Amino acid sequence: MRQQSSLARHLASAAVAAIFAVGLCGCQTTSDVTGSLMPKAEASPDADPRRTVEVSGERYRANPKDADAALAYGQALRAAGQRSQAAAVLEQASIAHPGNKALLAAFGRALADNGNFQAAFDVLTRAHTPDNPDWRILSVQGTVLDQLGRHDEARDYYASALRIVPDEPSVLSNLGLSYVLSRDLPKAEETLRKAYASGRADARVRQNLGLVVGLQGRFAEAESIVKADLPPDQAAANVAYLKQMLSRKDNPRSGSGRVPVASLNAPD
């Protein structure tokens, strides 16, 4: 009971503690969102991010005006956690190529990575058009609006994305987290279960569902969700992560009173 009353207090000051996994390029280049969004910097899962930065950086420095080289370098920097540098590279490229929507999408995402949410939203708006909307960018715009506390507006963007790709799990997952941030945990669970049941959901959806179930006090059920059908080592890691995230809601010093959000999902 104490945990649930504590949750209610912390939810009152909810803020997103999340990673934007946002697949933002007009092509299928995704890197780490949202949701959704995980642009993988066009590397294999076993690639060394530092090596990718080195290789793409050499190509970029050889021709800084090359839009594709700038895009690849920016994505590699983001994947390596060098967010400020990624934003700087993508900003310069966007200035040099103002009509390149893939660059605008990546730049908007990089701005969001750095906490510049309003600027990110404005740039993302230029990355697609009303007559040719990109559902991935719509979902990312939703996550940015959620970061700004504009949850009703965010859900309009998720709804627009879902009209293009019905039942897309990455969008549903972001929508579910939006409900978490506005303290509607039953609706969040319902939405995340729908995402999880699709058979196309990634590990973040599983983690987010487990987190929402745990936030409602059903800890045994939450553990069973995050470790189901996984090898023992991965199951143990997921359970440890769940406990870490849940502990943050009861420890004001660990998260500034924020509700923990496992991760936003990025459409691939």
Give each language-model segment a name.
Residues 67-68, 101-102, 134-136, 151, ...:
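Helix-start (N-cap) detector for alpha-helical repeat units in TPR-like alpha-solenoids
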Residues 62-63, 96-97, 127-131, 164, ...:
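Structural marker of alpha-solenoid helical repeat scaffolds
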Residues 72, 106, 139-140, 174, ...:
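Canonical tetratricopeptide repeat
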Residues 2, 16, 23-72, 76-80, ...:
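N-terminal leader/linker segments that initiate helical-solenoid repeat arrays
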Residues 31-36, 199, 203-205, 212-268:
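Terminal, low-structured helical/coil segments at or just beyond the last alpha-helical repeat
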